[in-house]
A protein has these predicted regions:
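N-terminal targeting leaders of membrane proteins
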Residues: 16-110, 114-121, 125-130, 238-240, ...
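Short loop/turn motifs that connect adjacent beta-strands in outer-membrane beta-barrel proteins
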Residues: 59-64, 129-141, 183-192, 233-247
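Transmembrane beta-strands of outer-membrane beta-barrel proteins
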Residues: 145, 149, 191-195, 245-251
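Interfacial helix-loop-helix junctions of multi-pass membrane proteins
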Residues: 152-174
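Residues that define the transmembrane beta-barrel architecture of outer-membrane proteins
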Residues: 173, 218-224, 245, 277-283
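Residues on the lipid-exposed face of transmembrane beta-strands in outer-membrane beta-barrel proteins
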Residues: 178-182, 224-230, 283
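Transmembrane beta-strands of outer-membrane beta-barrel pores
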Residues: 199-203, 253-259
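Acidic-aromatic/histidine active-site loop/patch
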Residues: 208-227, 231-244
Length: 283
């Protein structure tokens, strides 16, 4: 089953004060708050050396390499524990498609790939913006870190029991990275657009809280959204009421009935459950 790195995202977000997720209480978690914490963004032409103490440089160097080493370490540890990497001794190509009715997970996996890479890029950008003192290297580090994560997932899946290397995943990964880069480079874009997600565990996970660490696989518990923020009109210089900055128009997508935690019989579902597969687009 194609796996997504939401667990990695959460760990990254915890370490970045600049990114606000606005998590509510209860099972339902709103990830990737529509208005990510605004950080000062200078153009490359304005990037310059900032006088720093030796202690400051040491701290930034430590954070930089902890991130560069920590991201792949967390990913690989989780992947080998949960995703069956290494179960296959030969390379497997996958042809998963995108959002067709009979595709793998109905497209929920593709929106998850896009969202996860969007969030990891934005999180890592904020880290490297700090470690590189706003210099251009922040772009190189955040792009390479996020892209390498996506490629590593596909390489691992090529040797997993039932996955395979899927070029479609790499394409939607790139879309997520591209949206994130535009938001970081152009504050006006960020003031209008964001990606977010909502998660509420399905029955299988609600009854087995010890399995919640596998929540990236629980696609039927996820909803993925594109947020259009009316606050952006104020940044265009338009005289609009202040309350508009609290209003968003969300376009979302989710699927139900596709996962191994719903279809039976299996080691996850004892009955011959066969729920209807549903794809839903909503505003």
């Amino acid at each position: 089953m194609k796996r997504i790195t939401h667990a990695l995202i959460l760990l990254l977000l915890v370490s970045i004060p600049a990114v606000s997720t606005g998590m509510p209480l209860g099972w339902s978690a709103r990830l990737g708050a529509a208005h990510l914490g605004q950080t000062e963004r200078r153009s490359d032409a304005e990037d310059g050396a900032v006088p720093e103490t030796a202690g400051s440089n040491t701290t930034k160097t430590t954070v930089r390499y902890l991130t560069l080493v920590g991201v792949p370490t967390i990913l690989l540890s989780f992947a080998f524990s949960a995703w069956g990497w290494g179960d296959r001794s030969t390379w497997l190509w996958a042809n998963e498609g995108y959002f067709g009715k009979n595709t793998y997970e109905g497209g929920a996996d593709k929106t998850a790939h896009m969202f996860s890479h969007y969030m990891v890029f934005r999180a890592s950008y904020n880290i490297f913006n700090y470690t590189e003192s706003g210099g251009r290297a922040k772009w190189y580090y955040s792009t390479i870190t996020t892209s390498a994560m996506g490629l590593a997932i596909e390489l691992g899946d090529a040797y997993a029991g039932q996955n395979g290397f899927a070029y479609e995943d790499l394409i939607v990964d790139a879309v997520g990275i591209g949206i994130a880069a535009l938001c970081e480079r152009f504050p006006l874009v960020d003031s209008f657009v964001a990606l977010s997600a909502e998660y509420y565990p399905t029955k299988y996970f609600r009854h087995r809280p010890n399995k919640l660490w596998l929540f990236p696989d629980d696609y039927s518990g996820w909803k993925f959204l594109i947020n259009f923020k009316l606050a952006g009109f104020k940044d265009l210089g338009l005289d609009v009421p202040d309350f508009l900055r609290y209003i968003m128009i969300d376009v979302g997508y989710y699927c139900r009935g596709y996962t191994k935690y719903e279809q039976g019989p299996s080691k996850y579902v004892s009955s011959y459950a066969n729920p209807e597969k549903k794809q839903n687009l909503f505003i």
